[in-house]
């Protein structure tokens, strides 16, 4: 993993979302190890933190535009963190209503602090090339909460790009 983090950095990648369905494949220790490698390589990351008080979000000023990044995954393939785990993974727990509300509240709060909010979201069925109903509904909620850009991953195939309008537009 350390070599991969270094190679990503060398390739010009500066930010990664580690909230994916594979984030806990090697349990909490694997997640913490991954975060350590990313930190050593100088790669910013969203979606998880090595400690409960660590930040899972990231902001950066790019050309005078303050951009906030939030990372989440819809599921962790049935793996979960033990209640005593110190690390944090942002998950929606298979579109759980409370988890979605928490994410929308985070988007709204970040919108108050930044010029642009990008949500990096690992969701959708593998190899489905169409936007699913749950994805569409969540994307609209995020847009209404203030997300300017929603970057979806997880399906392993290209999906259509859509422009959404929020309720207040």
Q: Residue ranges of each PLM-predicted region?
A:
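Acidic, metal/ion-coordinating pockets
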Residues: 1-169
């Amino acid at each position: 993993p350390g070599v991969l983090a270094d190679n990503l950095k060398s390739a010009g990648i500066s930010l990664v979302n580690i909230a994916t369905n594979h984030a806990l494949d090697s349990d909490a220790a694997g997640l913490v190890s991954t975060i350590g490698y990313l930190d050593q390589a100088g790669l910013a990351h969203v979606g998880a933190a090595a400690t409960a008080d660590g930040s899972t979000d990231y902001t950066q000023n790019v050309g005078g535009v303050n951009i906030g990044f939030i990372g989440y995954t819809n599921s962790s393939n049935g793996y979960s963190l033990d209640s005593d785990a110190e690390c944090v993974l942002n998950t929606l727990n298979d579109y759980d209503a409370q988890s979605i509300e928490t994410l929308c509240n985070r988007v709204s709060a970040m919108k108050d602090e930044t010029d642009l909010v990008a949500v990096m979201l690992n969701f959708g069925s593998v190899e489905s090339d169409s936007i699913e109903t749950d994805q569409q509904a969540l994307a609209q909620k995020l847009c209404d909460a203030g997300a300017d850009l929603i970057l979806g991953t997880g399906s392993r195939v290209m999906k259509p790009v859509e422009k959404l309008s929020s309720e207040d537009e």
